[in-house]
Amino acid sequence: MSFTPGKQSSSRASSGNRSGNGILKWADQSDQSRNVQTRGRRAQSKQTATSQQPSGGNVVPYYSWFSGITQFQKGKEFEFAEGQGVPIAPGVPATEAKGYWYRHNRRSFKTADGNQRQLLPRWYFYYLGTGPHAKDQYGTDIDGVYWVASNQADVNTPADILDRDPSSDEAIPTRFPPGTVLPQGYYIEGSGRSAPNSRSTSRASSRASSAGSRSRANSGNRTPTSGVTPDMADQIASLVLAKLGKDAAKPQQVTKQTAKEIRQKILNKPRQKRSPNKQCTVQQCFGKRGPNQNFGGGEMLKLGTSDPQFPILAELAPTAGAFFFGSRLELAKVQNLSGNLDEPQKDVYELRYNGAIRFDSTLSGFETIMKVLNENLNAYQQQDGTMNMSPKPQRQRGQKNGQGENDNISVAAPKSRVQQNKIRELTAEDISLLKKMDEPFTEDTSEI
């Protein structure tokens, strides 16, 4: 007697988007052509919706009974503990729970910068004696094949399982017995749940077993849930942040060496492609401010595009189309002042432009824009005037601070004893005078 996964009369499928027979339908394994095939006969070599790989990737000519397991983290091995790894299917006894996982190398796609990026592989399960390696014995060393079986299964004989006919049988969502530990860096396709990382298997097993006992008390045919962890969004977010180097807990520090590398990278670009910032200032990118380059002052010259006020100014910047079609352009050949005299001289041209950016008071942030423009237009004139009014005296090389400052000081007259406020000892004459001052005054009545 051959077994058909998901065909047990009293079985109940998990929650989700259910089709007519109560089994989830997966877009990557459903047959759109609805070609009728004979049950019990092996499906013809035909591609699934995701098997047609114009940009690389191997072909999956057979339909798996279960949804796939997708890798989302590079460098992680696909493996299960002994006796684990066979998905649960209503109507299939434990003696037939044997087979292999087949690695499907998905296609590559073209990124925005023109590079090809290969998608990480996805694994599909096939029962022993079915699928692309139906004729291979259990345990054969094959690249892209991982063999799994339950402890009750006999791996020396093929599983008595029919091939899936996509016209009548739809894929079953992959679930595992309680306590199964999924490979780290993988998630079950369509479940939004990932493998447990630090949570103990025994704890998950005890919870699952208690839940299973309650389930058996209510309904003996309820499908047990897999021992997987909650949403993997946090894990994916941490991986992305680590890949981009933007870990919020450890802000990236810019050292002198990295700042020098950033500055050199900016200066290696053509002049019209440079973007000044903290590491490469406006003056380093475009030179000093003057009549021909009259914008920028104060903090904006130090921070460049990193200045908090710059984004609102960037709203005024013309697009490439407005620059070419809305400006007066003039091509002029200029003298090449770069390079050595013994090197071959290159022809250097300047595309000079003259245009205007028009806006009115209805523009969003108009007051702020006007404030920033007034602070930065011709700001170099105010800075030069301030420097000319109070020039800082420069110290000669080799001269210590304070030395030479007393050369131009006029010599004043020496102070008196009172000004000097010096303490001296009393003489005998001084003591005699003090005693007379203490005696009472008597009027002299003697006649002359």
UniProtKB/Swiss-Prot annotation:
Residues 29-38, 45-55, 383-393, 399-409 have a biased composition (Polar residues). Residues 61-190 form the CoV N NTD domain. The modification Phosphoserine is found at S167, S191, S390. It holds the Pfam family CoV_nucleocap. Homooligomer. Both monomeric and oligomeric forms interact with RNA. Interacts with protein M. Interacts with NSP3; this interaction serves to tether the genome to the newly translated replicase-transcriptase complex at a very early stage of infection. Packages the positive strand viral genome RNA into a helical ribonucleocapsid (RNP) and plays a fundamental role during virion assembly through its interactions with the viral genome and membrane protein M. Plays an important role in enhancing the efficiency of subgenomic viral RNA transcription as well as viral replication. This is Nucleoprotein.
